Design a protein with these regions (language model features):
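Long, charge-rich boundary regions
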Residues: 269-348
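Acidic, Ser/Thr- and proline-rich intrinsically disordered linker/docking segments
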Residues: 359-419
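Short, structured interface segments
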Residues: 204-219
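A composition-biased, non-transmembrane "mature-region" signal
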Residues: 233-236, 256, 278-280, 308-311, ...
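Cys/His-rich short segments
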Residues: 228-283
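Short, surface-exposed beta-strand/loop "edge" segments at domain boundaries and coil↔beta transitions
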Residues: 267, 324-326, 344-353, 384-392, ...
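Soluble catalytic domains of membrane acyltransferases
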Residues: 14-21, 25, 34-206, 222-223, ...
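Soluble, non-transmembrane catalytic domains of enzymes that act on hydrophobic metabolites at membranes
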Residues: 1-5
Length: 419
């Protein structure tokens, strides 16, 4: 049951992208070059010699600077990027003009597949960020099996772009605090067109997952990258929300280069090389992603024990069109193993109900200090025609909700394809 808006028209994502004018590729390159002035970066290509479009790019995603670095390598070729609808906020004409393909995150967007096919038929480059979010902790996020089928059906080469240092430069949980970090972008042809034709979908998926594996904190340690900013740990509690010493959730806080638990008092210091060290006692997780994955396992165990269920009354802002977020007021949100996500509320005197079954949602779009309008943590539950940005009572819960969404989805998969 949809929201009772004054108008019934939603932004149409089911339309084909335009083909970039050649001169526009130069403008994008020039603006990207200007944006990178003063930043230290390296661009590298591997097995790309002689490769001409059409081909598909899969890229990891860390910060907006990913687009600028990629544009430096793809120039002067035409590129169509897949972009979530919030990127169209206030300027859908501009995103359409540069050839972007609009979608809503984690929805069953059939027309997106058709648009990708059109780009390939045009003889151009299709760039997709299959993790569909900025990496929360600098490691590979969930990659769906549908990626292999997408590559197989288009029968063109696959290039994987791996950005290193971009997360360290601007971590998602503290994106406003830029650091002085060298960046390294690698374009690698992972599969030729012939290999795509000869390999099975499972083999293609295995190649994709292998090529897209990364760990920014390991990269920092191995390359002796020192982050000396005194506030380098501030914001880390948004992703490291559970204390590994006492097990308490949502009592973590940060100050300067330290993260600490307000419940038991234990403190950890973030070294300049990105490793953690306990101020007193045992260091449970020197490697930050290990702490993150430990939290994920705690959520999974809650789900398996039947103890997980999230219910809250949240503030909701919807985004049916591209020019403004619409305040819908308070609504009840529920997330459970059997029911997935449900949103129940009233708008303009009428009841609305939104439901995303657990099998239909392989991950959750979360935002830390969402920059579009209300600068707080939120999560977004989208349908094919609308997006609902939910501001929970406890803003620190969104990382746990993302874990729960992914683990519930995995547990609903047939045993043979669980990841």
């Amino acid at each position: 049951m949809e929201v009772n808006y004054r108008w019934k028209k939603h932004y149409k994502t089911a339309k084909y992208p335009i083909r970039q004018p050649k001169w526009l590729t130069w403008l994008i390159w020039f603006l990207s070059k200007c944006a990178l002035i003063g930043k230290k970066y390296k661009l590298e290509t591997i097995d790309m010699e002689g490769l001409e479009p059409p081909y598909i790019i899969f890229s990891n995603h860390m910060a907006f600077i990913d687009f600028e670095l990629s544009a430096m390598v793809t120039y002067p070729k035409r590129v169509n990027n897949v972009v979530n609808i919030d990127g169209y906020h206030m300027m859908p004409w501009l995103l359409t003009w540069i050839g972007s393909i609009c979608t809503r995150k984690f929805t069953n967007d059939i027309h997106l597949v058709k648009s990708i096919r059109r780009v390939v038929q045009n003889g151009d480059i299709l760039c997709l960020y299959p993790e569909a979010r900025y990496t929360p902790i600098g490691t590979t996020s969930f990659l769906p099996d549908s990626l292999g089928r997408l590559v197989k059906m288009n029968k063109v080469p696959l290039v994987v772009v791996t950005h290193h240092g971009n997360y360290l430069y601007s971590p998602f949980w503290a994106y406003k605090n830029k650091r002085k970090v060298p960046m390294h972008t690698v374009f690698r042809q992972v599969l030729t067109a012939q290999q795509v034709q000869e390999m099975t979908v499972d083999q293609i998926n295995a190649a994709i997952r292998s090529a897209m594996e990364y760990d920014e904190y390991r990269y920092q340690l191995e390359n002796n990258i020192r982050i000396t900013e005194p506030n380098r740990a501030e914001g880390l509690q948004k992703v490291l929300y559970q204390c590994p010493h006492c097990g308490t959730e949502f009592q973590m806080a940060t100050s300067g280069a330290e993260i600490f638990c307000n419940h038991c008092g234990k403190r950890w210091y973030m070294e300049e090389n990105g490793q953690l060290r306990a101020i007193d006692g045992e260091t449970e997780f020197p490697h930050i992603p290990d702490w993150f994955e430990w939290e994920r396992e705690q959520v999974r165990q809650q789900i398996l024990a039947g103890e997980y269920c999230y219910e809250d009354e949240v503030d909701i802002y919807s985004f049916p069109r591209c020019y403004r977020f619409i305040p819908l007021g308070r609504a009840k949100v529920r997330h459970s193993f059997d029911g997935g996500f449900t949103i129940d509320g009233h708008y303009r005197g009428e009841y609305y109900h939104i439901h995303r079954p657990p099998k239909s949602l392989n991950s959750l779009h979360v935002e830390y200090d969402f920059h579009r309008f209300r600068k707080e943590n939120c999560f977004d539950v989208s349908t094919e025609t609308d997006s609902f940005y939910c501001y929970p009572t406890n803003p620190d819960i969104i990382t746990k909700l993302a874990f729960a969404t992914e683990e519930i989805y995995k547990l609903h998969l047939p045993t043979k394809v669980k990841v």
